[in-house]
């Protein structure tokens, strides 16, 4: 895989550079190599291949939710309303997830280890998302989208298969997650290769702009976490409070379980017939 080879080469180069700097300044070799680079030198892949057919399946299910349970059951206005609400919900969620995976400590936590390492590598190789097919980047969400789909389905069945708004909101959350991946990809894309409509949306504040996202790639990487850019300030404010890894993991798990449920309840009250 092209991105994996590039990352591995960059890892070796970065490691050699770190050692060389240590030798030249102190005469001894110190253990100053970043943890993610140590992992790669130890045999782990910085990026792994995801199952791309799952992406197609998740997109189809999401569209089914939006058409069958959104437009046909809830109506057009509630479905559009759900989009507006879930835009903010997904953006905040993406920021929280970003904080979690940017935390080096989580490279040692089961299930979080691989994606956390990939996020660390993204700081070394910012354009990695542009060097591979878009569907491959969408595949990075396979686990988290699959988890949401299982949760939405279980709650829908448990509720007597009548909670159409839950699946509508859930469909939007999954589709907007992929839109977030596209936003992020275009924020790193060369202007000459970026679609004109994306540049237009970036210039008008509808898509994440390269200038805004560059802020996150400037050390200490503690700003502009959100992929859609509408809830940046609360995530940044929380991120600078030094609340600790456990707090952020707990917040991430809580949002995974409850944000769409709470949003769907609110929407159901607003659009009650």
Please tell me what each predicted stretch does:
Residues 86, 172, 178-191, 195:
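Flexible secondary-structure boundary motifs
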Residues 198-202:
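Low-complexity, glycine/proline/serine-enriched flexible coil segments
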